[in-house]
Amino acid sequence: MPALAVAEALQRRGVEVSFAGSSERMEAELVPQAGFVFDSFRISGFSRRPGLELARGLARSLVAPFSCLRILRRRRPDVVFGGGGYVAGPMVLAAWLARIPAALSEADAHLGLANRLAEPFARRVFLSFPIADREKSKYRVTGRPLPERSRPPERAQARERFGLPQQGPVLLVFGGSQGARALNELVAERFGESGPAILHLAGERDYPALTERVKRPDYVLLGFTNEFGAALAACDLVLARAGGSVWELAAAGKPALLVPYPYATADHQAKNARCFVEGGGAISLPEGELERVPGLVLELLNDSIRLETMSAAMLRLARPNAAEEIADELIELARRRRKEAA
């Protein structure tokens, strides 16, 4: 959760931080666990199909800015930071109405719809990737902020934690919180009975069906893990989609074989992947060429020199100070507001 990384950086600078968001999303659990105050308001995304879900999303979006204004009056912040997505929009709009400076964060190489709608009300937009045709005075390319808890622990400890062998290469497979069915099916089919050691984060949807297809002790299949940093530390190569989590691979210096989700808005996952391919840290394949993945996995895991080269490239691409840069900019926005109000 990138907003937590920024909150931690602000806290280290002596700033008081509180969160606001939907009670129906993961932040309602993660934020209090991290020790921050959490205010909730009702908001949901828009369904792309006409019907009850679309009507509910529209109704909540109309009411949400007023709920956010009440939160702002109670908390009286000097600056607002929106972590991106539909939850951030109402709060950024409310901040604009209350004349409080606000900033947004974009995880992908394409400005999403929610951020495009909220962008006119923000003073800053922090980008994980460069995006063409954006006003330089408002946009900052910082990379994706990562919480300290996502930093990888020591390799041997991480492998012990997941029950993986201490010797030999390990492949990490994941497709985001919901998993990636095409990757899940491919890996279980090809490596379920033999192959390299694997840590497979399949997502809760596909996990039950896959358990019957894994036949060996060095293939560790999980629905999800709260210790993603440890999962990265345990592996030598990652097979994944190309969402915002690719920045965590870069920060950990993990070579990647990326299969962008082909139906992502504006093909942003392919754009994300391109950044890391051009930097030398990843290989990208379209989903239509999935049959090449097993061979590439084995080829890479058997080439330690190439893996080391790709790892070094990933570390060069990483932006480990993203949260610190954003925190400094937010503090400057808050200072300007106080100066203007004096």
Task: Label the model's feature ranges.
Residues 11-63, 67, 142, 204-206, ...:
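Conserved nucleotide-sugar phosphate-binding/catalytic loop shared by glycosyltransferases and other
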Residues 319-342:
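C-terminal alpha-helical cap of glycosyltransferases
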